[in-house]
């Protein structure tokens, strides 16, 4: 087993407790690099809305939370050697934190265990903090845009037609990732956002922006798209967002994909629109043990898509053609992760991706 870790020692990590929430523990075992697992010394993590939603029945006591991390490989399991990684390699990944089926796999730890196939190599020109902010957003967007919505093109094989695609929530981290991918794939992204975020969203590549608080938002999108919009990605997913997306889609209908379960009664208002929602961790190739409606069996086809898409994202990172959302980097250790989750729950985060730097905390 290349790399030696004293797994009898303990580490700091954010774990589930018996009260249905998370807490900082300094008594978490350091994981072994067994089977196809790799252990990474964490240098930065990012905090996503999904992390803040891990409450109540989604919490497994003792399981490590967190999806996005970046760091350096410090141990490699024997079945992971075929992936070509070496000790000291700079890597990042999006994994399934708070996982009842693999409770020792989670990003919010000083030493992260993950299956080798989830890892993405970080280019030398990119910082750990930037890399930690990329994977969940860009992996989920790939699934939503090029698998669920079925867009006819990709960043490496652009569409011949600059078809318009609506990104609802364009100023979110997922929204700016989607806009970049759409541009690279030859599409024309348009987006909803608050007026104060217009310049940010256009900087990432949106052709036009629309104020979601405007009662005429959907009508203005229909006018701009000449009643021909066929694709909508909903990065917010609530009643208002779905109503605007459905009202924006053209007269012949189209496809709508959300990042969370959507209101079925709104979906029923337009039968000519095909609605779907995605769960990013399904691309990792394992069962998802979260409660319904998120829990599900592994899907070999989506795993295959995920591995192909991960390789594509790694290539885009190496070329320097994608960038993270504007970062709010916080220092001070794992306790800052708890603060970030609380800030997301309190809706205090706007236009920034929360990243915790752990470089000085080992």
From Swiss-Prot:
| E.C. number | 1.-.-.-
Instruction: Kindly indicate whether the keyword Nucleotide-binding belongs to this entry.
Output: yes
Q: Quick one: which residues bind NADP(+)?
A: 50-53, 171-174, 194-197, 212, 259-260, 349-350
Q: Which family does it belong to?
A: Belongs to the zinc-containing alcohol dehydrogenase family.
Name assigned to this protein:
Trans-enoyl reductase phm4
Output the Pfam families linked to this UniProt entry: ADH_N (PF08240), ADH_zinc_N (PF00107)
**What Gene3D superfamilies does its record include?**
Medium-chain alcohol dehydrogenases, catalytic domain, NAD(P)-binding Rossmann-like Domain
Per the entry, what this protein does is: Trans-enoyl reductase; part of the gene cluster that mediates the biosynthesis of the trans-fused decalin-containing tetramic acid phomasetin, the stereochemical opposite of the HIV-1 integrase inhibitor equisetin. The PKS module of phm1 together with the enoylreductase phm4 catalyze the formation of the polyketide unit which is then conjugated to L-serine by the condensation domain of the phm1 NRPS module. Activity of the Dieckmann cyclase domain (RED) of phm1 results in release of the Dieckmann product intermediate.
| Cited PANTHER family | HYPOTHETICAL OXIDOREDUCTASE (EUROFUNG) (PTHR45348), TRANS-ENOYL REDUCTASE STHE (PTHR45348:SF1)
In its UniProt record, a GO molecular function of this protein is: nucleotide binding
Q: Outline the subunit composition.
A: Monomer.
- Pathway it belongs to? Secondary metabolite biosynthesis
- Any idea which UniProt keywords this protein has? NADP, Nucleotide-binding, Oxidoreductase
What is the gene name?
phm4
Known InterPro entries for this protein?
ADH-like_C, ADH-like_N, GroES-like_sf, NAD(P)-bd_dom_sf, PKS_ER, Trans-enoyl_RdTase-like
Q: What happens when the gene is disrupted?
A: Impairs the production of phomasetin.
Q: Which residues bind substrate?
A: 136-143, 280-284
Keyword Nucleotide-binding assigned: yes
